[in-house]
A protein has these predicted regions:
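Non-catalytic, mobile gating and regulatory segments of ester bond hydrolases
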Residues: 1-149, 153-308
Length: 308
């Protein structure tokens, strides 16, 4: 991971979990908390920072995930954090570096699938399955509600993990809240059908013209799961616009057209206040569909920006 995905300790907001309610269904307060957990999941190389931030949020660290992955995709490791409150177990997965997003999009569009779940994401979930399962089982025994979350490719790893826990005969997971931010299409119809127990409590947030949720293209037969909440470039997300049932948006062709129009009409303003030099100017140089994908953009659209 590059410094794009890491945030100075003093920029992690102490109010990230102020609106978190483990007993609620979808709320923007829970979405904010989950997106901040996704941001922290990018920091697995900095154990002291993770400890300090979890303490700031009054969370208990259960595990830090960092495991090598052998995959057809450009994925070196599965990274994540497992933490808990007295009422919730939270499993958060990191995604990919913003500078690699264009390479990932190209990877997604090449080749034909051989299974009903994207092999790269399934391999990433398998790499940490035993440790994640142990944490989830412990949370269930302690009567804590399960939250699974991920940004970017981490959202896809979250879906693959949730499906593995559903299919685990001993665990037999049937209740969890799954939040993804800018996640790609992950499952084909057979796997989507098996994901049914969590379909209505899976929430996919998509910011602006983020290109990642539109891939792989539909001719490869991958689709989304859960209920989508979309917002315009710059936000805000509106809880009232969450549909009551599944929808497979955004469409590949529509997002691609938007991206092409942005390139033709000129550079896109950052939808958030930039971080200090050099990160701010470097983020501004990314393509529009990638700018809308970065954690800074999602946190801003959720009302808890990194740079307040």
């Amino acid at each position: 991971m590059s410094f794009f995905t890491e945030v100075d300790t003093d920029l992690y907001r102490p109010d990230a979990f102020s609106g978190f309610d483990a007993q609620a269904k979808f709320t923007l307060g829970n979405a904010r908390a989950m997106m901040w957990m996704c941001q922290l999941a990018y920091e697995t190389a900095h154990g002291d920072k993770i400890d300090a931030i979890l303490n700031r949020w009054q969370l208990t660290k259960i595990d830090v995930l960092e495991r090598a992955v052998t995959s057809s995709l450009r994925m070196g490791q599965t990274r994540g954090i497992i933490a808990a409150t007295d009422k919730a177990t939270i499993v958060a997965f990191a995604g990919t570096d913003p500078v690699s997003v264009q390479d990932w999009v190209a990877d997604f569009t090449l080749g034909r699938p051989t299974g009903d779940i994207h092999a790269g994401f399934d391999a990433a979930a398998a790499a940490v399955q035993d440790r994640v399962r142990q944490a989830i089982a412990g949370g269930i025994a302690a009567r804590r509600k399960l939250f699974i979350t991920g940004h970017s490719l981490g959202g896809a790893i979250g879906f693959a993990t949730a499906l593995r826990m559903i299919e685990d005969r001993a665990l037999n997971l049937r209740e969890a809240e799954v939040y993804s931010f800018g996640a790609p299409r992950t499952l084909r119809p057979g796997a989507t059908a098996r994901y049914a127990p969590l379909m209505n409590t899976t929430y996919r947030l998509v910011h602006g013209n983020d290109v990642v949720p539109s891939v792989p293209p539909p001719d490869l037969d991958f689709g989304h799961v859960g209920r989508p909440l979309l917002c315009p470039h710059g936000g805000p997300f509106d809880e009232a616009k969450l549909p009551q049932s599944f929808d497979d948006v955004p469409r590949f062709e529509r997002q691609l057209l938007r991206g092409l129009l942005q390139f033709v009409t000129g550079p896109l303003d950052l939808p958030f206040r930039p971080r200090p030099f050099p990160i701010g100017p470097l983020l501004a140089a990314l393509p529009p569909g990638v700018i809308d994908h970065v954690p800074d953009a999602y946190l801003h659209a959720l009302g808890t920006p990194i740079m307040a």
